Amino acid sequence: MSQKLYEFLSLQDDDDAKVDFHNTNLSGPSNVIIYVSGNWYDEFKVSEIISLAKKYPDAKILISGGVGRLTLPYVQRMGGEPLYLLERLTQEASACDELSSIKERCILCNSSIVTTHNVKFLMYYLSQCADMEGWNASDNSSKAYSKYKIIVVDEGFLLRRLKATILQQIEVHTKVKKDFPSSMIESLEFISPADCQTSADMSKKHMHGNAVAAFLQIGEFKRLVNYSTGNGPRLFSKELAGLHDTRAEEIWKVVSQLEDDFMDDLDRLLSIGDEKELKRAILPIFQNSVLCEGFDL
């Protein structure tokens, strides 16, 4: 059952994983942006970002994040998620001559604590690109001549909410604020690392396996629902979240079944009141099954 929920959240339908903007008539090659919204899964994204950096040697790598509620202790000590990820990318690229300039290709925002703030950094970067080309919303003769292919990398089950957030912010910044023209964007592509293609892959990243994977996926789905219906901060529409058709009803049934299957485990996790103890229970495991520094289960 959890695989069906995971596939929905991780955009495994090709139609969900890529958005083509057919409103651009700009010719010439596209500029590529590799975009990363920071979280505690950043370690798992390193190899995918390195691979994309090799494939697109001129691509800029935008990394946004900071220190939030679930930022890992040693990442906090390094100064925040973008600084940690930059360090890891630099380490991995050091053995590859073609990536010797990877540090200079990275652009960081280290002041965000929530996904929406992370995404606004991407919008700000696009607006600066438009400004440098002379874009002016009040001047009908002004144009932006460059187009951008944006590749978004994140842990699989987080992609649907991130996609909805990005699409909503693009609408706000192109139609309301008019910070840049929508014709600048050629496409959005959403990618998860090779080792997080299934719910089973996700389970392997957590000490308590299937129970924690179910806990996090159920929580992510309910967050997606709340953010699109106004029960929480309404950050995007049900249509952008993919909750406007019969799929939503099907996924609710899956969630209900998972809650029944993992009732005892979910009750135990939901009853944890101490934030540090909750982190210990649900944080991911990194290389060689070594638990993140500073936590002892």
Regions found by a protein language model. Give the residues of each.
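A structural signal for short, hydrophobic/glycine-enriched beta-strand patches
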Residues: M1-Q217, I285-L297
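C-terminal accessory extensions appended to soluble enzyme cores
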Residues: M202-L297
